[in-house]
Every structure is written in C-alpha cells, then in structure tokens.
Regions:
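Structural motif
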Residues: 37-42, 71-75, 309, 360-361, ...
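Conserved catalytic cores of phosphodiester-cleaving nucleases, focusing on short active-site segments
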Residues: 19-57
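Glycine-rich phosphate- or other oxyanion-binding loops that anchor nucleotides, phosphorylated ligands
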Residues: 305-342, 348
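Nucleic-acid nuclease catalytic cores
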Residues: 60-93
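Short, charged/polar "capping" segments at the starts of alpha-helices
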Residues: 75-81, 276-278, 392-398
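Acidic-basic catalytic patches of nuclease active cores, encompassing PD-(D/E)XK
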Residues: 1-17
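SIR2/sirtuin-family catalytic core signature
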Residues: 96-154, 160-162, 174-175, 179, ...
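Glycine-rich phosphate-binding "P-loop"
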Residues: 36-47, 219-248, 321-338
C-alpha cells in the first residue's frame, strides 16, 4: 500500500461491522473503497463460510464499499466459484495470492516475519524459569493419550544404544580408523600409543564432516566393490565394548508390551545398526519383525522394527546383501531418492502416527526434511514429541576461562536458546520434552505407560 501511495486503516467499522482493514483509494487493480477481512483457519468450513459471505455481501450491497477482499488460507476451486456467483466484487485471496504478495515484497515479508518471531520470543521470556517442568507434564499427558489409543511410534537414535555401553559415533569412527591404521602397517610393529595418537590427530583434522570420514574409512577398509570387509569392521567396532544393563532400553521394552486392550506401540523406527532392542524384546517373548530393506514384510501380530540405516546383528551373521547408511555416498543416495523404502516408511509413520523420539540429536538433515514435509500436510497442531536435553549454566561458564561471565546473562541466553529450540522444533511438527539428565528418560517413559 505504501509503495502505491495509498492509505490503509486497520480495524475499520462499517455499519456496526468490524473489518480487518480499509483503503479509501483501493489497492492494485481494485478500485476503492476496498475493505479487507481475514479468516484464520487452515480447514474449509462451509457453514462458517456461508455466514461470512452473507455478512460481506451485505456490506457490499450497502454500496459503501466497492470491493471486498477476503483473505482465507483454506481456499479451494469450489469456494472460488461460489464467491464469484455470490458477488463478483467479493475477491478471494488464498494461498496463491498470499505467496504472490510475499514474493513481490520479500524484504517487507521478512521484516514482518522477524518482528512476529521476536514478539513471540519476548512473550515466552516472560514465563517463569520453572515453567518448563509444568509444560513437560502437560506434554506427557498428551503422549499418554496417544499411547492409550495405540497410536504411538518410537523413533530411536544413538543415545539409546549408548545407554547400554555401545560406542557413540565418534568412538565408532576412532575404532574404525585404528583398524585402518593397523591394516596399513600390516606386520610392522607399531605400538598402541602411536596408533592412538595418529587416530586422534586424524579425527581432529577431519572433524568438520564425520560422514566424509566414514566415506574415507569405507574406501580404506573395503575391497574393490565388496562392502563385506567394511561391514565386518563396523560390526567388530560396534560390539567390541562390554554391554551394560540399560534402564532406558528396559523402559522402551515395557512400552512395547501389549496391554489387555491391545498393543500400544504401532512400530519402531531405529537409526541404529545394533540389535539391542530385538534382544530385549526377545527376553519378554514379544513377537517382532526386523525390517532393514524393501522386500521385508511383517505379520499383523508382529511389532515392526525398521532399521532405516541398516542392520548388523551382534550374535548372528549379517546379511551380505544388506547395505548401511553410514558413509557420505550412502547418505546422499537415500537423501536424493524420495521413493527409497526408508524414506517412505519414515514419511508414512510421521503422517499417520504420533511419534516419540528418544536418543536422537535431531541434527540429521534427512529426518528434519521428512519432518518438515509431514508437518506441511498436517494441521497447525504438533503431533510428535522429542526428548531433548536442556543446556545448563555449566555448559557455558568455563571456570578456567580468564573472562568472567555474568551468571544472570547466561541464564537469559539459555532461556532464549531453549525457547528458540522449541519454536524451531514446532515448525517441524514436534514438541520438545525437556530433561536435564539422561537418567530422567526411563522414569518419564514409565510414567507414560502408567
């Protein structure tokens, strides 16, 4: 409006009808006076629309307004046809028109979006510090409801396996590189300290991309086009450490045990290679089906466990035809193929079920992409939940540092960080269930099962 040199008045009243906007001189190709009405909804409601159209048509009939622009995101061809027949001066601006305005006024649109986001952050900062625990209880109640309905799927990350003593990503790469160095020196006598020093230095130098390191190691540990040597090396590194009992895996297993009314967990998607979940389910004699490639199917009485990055069992031989999403090229392959079976499984699960994410850092760009796609197809309500650890003051205040950091400033920074993290995850259709210590997660899972 400013670019066209035309005045705009918000919250304008005509004959007792309060409208969202008014321009005496019109807008664009629409001759004035022009009035604006905005309806905030993402679903078309015929009853509400008929009432709205009747009200706006009445204002147009009074001839005090030349054109009426209805801004309504839940537009449809049927609705446009209906409005044209009612009154040709009743104009609909739907998603297409709104996006067109945004594209034509990108700087202004970005300014508005940033201003709204800052207002939202400021409002959230006024909450009391301990409100997050109250919010957590409310979220757990929502998860309980979905669990009781049997509409929960579990998404499990490396944190689950690490809770039982298996190596994290960095430790796994260290073990593989040690294997690689030993392979280079072959029969030469090289002491363990030298190998360890070389390994640590290599990982430090190439720390910017762990996927690139994995690709490098795969090339070094494989033979020609055969991945068997590499998968064997991964298996050795994965299961070399002593397993420990895991309260987290026990709590996950308990969630999966059916109740009288039936199974409450519909499926498990794991991004881990190991069989710790299968091993735990076997102990309680729960029927399951491990699925790690397209051809696999499960029976109705089996709990499907999808290993979307591949599967390497501990005590059994691995499938020689199986592939791992471990290195850079494998990740690129999955990322670039929208109809890859693992993408289809994840997307269907995210669209159809309430997902509870455990032990995931949520930094995986492919998972974030799938979450965003699923969120676009859903209503504005978030239907997924993720356990995420809160940052503490100690993580930002370094006692050894020469710079004295004000604790009050750190508290404000952390509070803002946590709010932004929540808003960012909400844009991916996910609500954050905060925890401070990993030992809290099994307790919270047990609370969901009650």
């Amino acid at each position: 409006m400013e670019k066209q040199g035309k005045q705009f008045i918000s919250d304008y009243v005509i004959d007792g009808n309060r409208l969202d906007g008014y321009s005496k001189n019109g807008i664009g190709n629409y001759e004035g006076p022009v009035a604006f009405e905005i309806k905030y909804t993402h679903r078309y409601n015929p009853m509400i629309m008929r009432y709205t159209v009747r009200q706006l048509t009445g204002i147009l009939d009074s001839e005090k307004i030349k054109h009426m622009i209805l801004i309504y995101p839940a537009d449809s061809d049927k609705m446009r046809y209906f409005l044209r027949n009612e009154n040709p001066n009743l104009i609909l601006w739907g998603i297409t028109e709104i996006n067109g305005l945004i594209d034509a006024n990108k700087e202004e649109a970005e300014y508005i979006a940033n201003s709204l986001f800052k207002l939202e952050i400021k409002k959230e900062l006024n909450r009391r510090d301990n409100d997050w625990k109250k919010s957590r209880e409310e979220l757990l109640t929502s998860v309980k409801k979905a669990y009781k309905k049997g509409n929960i799927s579990l998404l499990l990350g490396a944190g689950v396996s690490c809770s039982a003593g298996l190596p994290n990503w960095k430790t796994l790469l260290n073990s593989l590189y040690t294997n690689f160095v030993n392979k280079i020196f072959n029969d030469d006598t090289v002491d363990d300290d030298t190998i360890k020093a070389i390994t640590n230095k290599f990982i430090e130098i190439n720390n910017n991309s762990t996927l690139a390191i994995a690709r490098y190691l795969k090339a070094g540990l494989s033979q020609k086009d055969d991945d068997i040597m590499f998968i064997s090396a991964v298996k050795d590194a994965l299961y070399s450490s002593q397993r420990t009992s895991s309260p987290l895996i026990e709590s996950i297993t308990n969630l999966c045990i059916p109740k009288r009314s039936g199974a409450k967990v519909k499926s498990i998607i794991t991004y881990n290679f190991d069989d710790l979940i299968e091993e735990s389910l076997s102990k309680v004699k729960l029927e399951y089906k491990t699925i790690y490639r397209d051809e696999e199917q499960h029976d109705s009485d089996e709990l499907p466990i999808y290993h979307v990055h591949g599967f390497i069992p501990g005590r059994e031989s691995f499938d020689r035809e199986a592939s791992l999403v471990f290195s850079e090229e494998a990740y690129h392959k999955v990322y670039s193929e929208p109809y890859h079976w693992s993408n289809l499984v994840q997307l269907a699960t995210l669209r159809e079920n309430n997902c509870l994410m455990i032990g995931l850092s949520l930094s995986d760009p492919n998972l974030r992409r799938l979450l965003e796609i699923a969120a676009q197809k859903q209503s504005k309500n978030c239907r997924h939940y993720a356990f995420i650890q809160r940052l503490s003051n100690d993580s930002l205040i370094d006692d050894s540092s020469c710079v004295k950091i004000n604790e009050a400033s750190v508290n404000k920074i952390l509070q803002t960080h946590h709010i932004i993290q929540e808003k960012m995850m909400e844009s991916l259709g996910t609500r954050v269930i905060w925890f401070e210590d990993y030992s809290e997660i099994p307790v919270l899972l047990d609370e969901i099962r009650k």
